[in-house]
Amino acid sequence: MNITWNWYEQLESAHARAFTVAKATKAEVLDTIRWATEQAIANGTGEREYIKKLEPMLKELGWWGKAKDENGNEVQLGSPRRLRTILRTNKITAYHAARYAQQMENVDEQPYWRYVAVNDSRTRASHLALHGKIYRADDPIWQTMYPPNDWGCRCRVEALSEYAVQSRGLKISSSDGEMEMEEAVVGIDKDTGEEIRTTVSKIKTDQGEMKVGAGWNYNVGSAAFGTDVAVLRKLQQVKNRELRQQTIQAINNSEARHKAFADWVLANLGKRGASARYMSAGLVTTEIAEAVTEITQGGKNAELVLVMSEKRLAHANSDKHHEGGVGLTAEEYASISRIVANPSLVLWDTLEGHNNLIYINQERTIQVIVDVPNKHSIKPKEKVDAIINAYKVDMNNVKRQLSGGNYVLLKGKL
């Protein structure tokens, strides 16, 4: 959740990584708008009802009408028009993020993607430059030109199989060497008069030139998938170890993230045909990552981003576990991200063939097994650490394993 005065302070992939509302200065305001927007999208609420419900809440919080910003400039806060834009933008980005996820899951069967514009009087001429063009799913063009590509963009992507392409004699294009980048002005700083600039990508085709709108130079789907990876890459540039550790812990403690993980568990637990798609369960902290590297003498290095796939959730929820009395309840599986965030114990399993991290909640006698780094198939592919199992644990056995040297205590006390 990010707070900002100007939308261009949250350019590109931040739109997919954080619910952002320009000029929201209170976390309570932002949380209220986010909650109402998520509910509206989930329930199919119309714009009028959305605005009618949200306006009195925002007025009560003092986020409505005109006000002075921190520099004394007059700014427009909440308004029906702004709320309408918020709802429309979040609806379209949510739709395309979900569509991207589905297409990535099926990319082996449908490895070609076709750009489809609406092609009516409202369609931007630049977007028509890509209409009907087909590129491989792994072509770099989709990193920045997967819709939406501007405010109000209605374009979409259609996935095609090898058979469909060959049987219909369709032409496959490549963006290799064709993509260009240029600067675009997205705003003016009222205090300094300085132009606020960002980078946008463009490509020329035989149908014209396609240029992404300022602030949309990213893929909403891959950005949502790659949230934690991108955050970690940024955090590794922070030289202050304590600050880096505090930031990771703050991310791990996010209630919104815990709820998202719990919702994912409840939606996938017991589902037939579990896939390799995954959900973030948190981040491996700096101290634990350093301990893993030290204890393995550099043989193992945590990737820091911790995920759980549908397949591993299904494995943890196996009949074997439940028949053996170690299976968890749905609520306990949903609590895995909380155990990762604040474990009672963190251990390293030194047994040959294991070499895993173990997160334990002593009160609930639950252990979460982590593969560092992940060796299993996941979609989309990414360098991560992965939760491979979770079940009830006998704490007396944990003590025996520690005494015998099979486990090494990295954090916590028995």
UniProtKB/Swiss-Prot annotation:
Record-stated family: To phage Mu protein F.
Sections of the chain in a coiled coil: none
Lineage, opening ranks: Bacteria, Pseudomonadati, Pseudomonadota, Gammaproteobacteria, Pasteurellales
Organism, as annotated: Haemophilus influenzae (strain ATCC 51907 / DSM 11121 / KW20 / Rd)
Purpose: Involved in virion morphogenesis.
Protein name: Mu-like prophage FluMu F protein
